[in-house]
């Protein structure tokens, strides 16, 4: 199985089963949909109005080279193992701990309703968190590496319990031959030097919530009194990113119908010095004014194309792609 598409003047072919990605010329690109169902002579006839027989013959040689190298039209070698894989004993490998059902921001698109999840505002107790870690260990089977994300609401509103649970997890590692990877997700309002020092020592990853340009961020992520949070959090996020040597963190933004030009927000975050960036579409009920609509899809695709075109000049990580800044 192959998947073909064009982007920024490139003819791109992905071999689905091997994961190989090829940049090919136009002749090869046009031949590939015909290649497995037609003979070479039939292809020459079908494409004779566009290419010469020699061009098609040369392209066929290139296709055969890729096939013989095992990177084009490859078989799915895992298909026969799929059912056995599904029958394997299941284990729990990760937890997202809602350590705080409360928040100090009032983000307009928040599915947690200012952190309370349509319930009452409260903070997770140490005892509940401890039992959650015990559950994870007890149900992790032979898996050694376990993951826990401190989430909310805003986790820093329950910071002491976060620290206590990390300490408990470290104790349990030794007893059960496990290794915890802790992650902290924060809006940055309560971020300070003490939190940074602890996070740099204990958190394998830190997720920093920011939507991009000041006017975009402040519109969607105000504090409870209606004031924007951009100016408060940006210097802290920059300091944390540098203190982690621009690794093992990422700034996480959400784009809505209010900023369908979200490539500008990605580039803005890169200009602020962030090298690990993820900006994702909002998840919202269709009747929300900021919700993306089907008619917005072409504009959204165009923004991704713009970001792809910036690959050689901007450094950011998005959907698994790390793009290095060129000197």
Predicted regions and their residues:
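Alpha-helical scaffolding segments of alpha/beta enzyme cores, especially the outer helices
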Residues: 131-134, 160, 164-171, 194-197, ...
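Radical SAM enzyme [4Fe-4S]-AdoMet core and its adjacent flexible, acidic
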Residues: 219-231, 238, 242-327
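Conserved alpha-helical substructure of the radical SAM core
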Residues: 50-51, 57-197, 202
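Acidic, low-complexity/disordered tracts enriched in E/D and polar residues
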Residues: 1-35
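Conserved radical SAM core fold
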Residues: 115-116, 155-157, 188-193, 205-227, ...
């Amino acid at each position: 199985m192959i998947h073909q598409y064009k982007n920024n003047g490139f003819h791109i072919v992905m071999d689905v089963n091997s994961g190989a990605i090829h940049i090919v010329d136009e002749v090869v690109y046009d031949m590939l949909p015909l290649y497995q169902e037609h003979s070479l002579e039939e292809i020459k006839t079908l494409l004779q109005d566009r290419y010469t027989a020699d061009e098609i013959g040369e392209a066929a040689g290139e296709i055969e080279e890729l096939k013989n190298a095992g990177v084009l039209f490859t078989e799915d070698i895992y298909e026969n193992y799929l059912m056995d894989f599904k029958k394997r004993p299941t284990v729990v490998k990760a937890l997202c701990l809602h350590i705080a059902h409360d928040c100090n921001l009032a983000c307009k698109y928040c599915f947690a309703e200012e952190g309370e999840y349509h319930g009452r505002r409260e903070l997770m107790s140490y005892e509940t968190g401890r039992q959650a870690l015990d559950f994870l260990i007890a149900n992790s089977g032979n898996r050694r590496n376990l993951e826990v994300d401190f989430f909310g609401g805003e986790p820093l509103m329950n910071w002491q319990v976060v620290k206590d649970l990390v300490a408990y997890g470290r104790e349990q590692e030794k007893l059960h031959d496990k290794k915890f990877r802790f992650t902290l997700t924060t809006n940055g309002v309560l971020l300070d030097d003490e939190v940074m020092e602890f996070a740099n020592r204990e958190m394998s990853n830190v997720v920093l919530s920011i939507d991009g340009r000041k006017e975009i961020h402040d519109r969607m992520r105000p504090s409870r009194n209606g004031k924007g949070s951009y100016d408060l959090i940006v210097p802290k996020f920059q300091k944390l990113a540098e203190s982690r040597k621009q690794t093992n963190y990422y700034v996480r933004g959400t784009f809505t119908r209010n900023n369908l030009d979200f490539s500008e927000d990605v580039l803005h975050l890169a200009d602020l010095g962030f090298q690990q960036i993820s900006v994702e579409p909002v998840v919202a009920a269709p009747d929300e004014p900021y919700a993306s609509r089907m008619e917005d899809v072409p504009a959204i695709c165009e923004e991704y194309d713009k970001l792809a075109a910036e690959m050689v000049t901007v450094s950011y990580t998005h959907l698994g792609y790390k793009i290095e800044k060129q000197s």
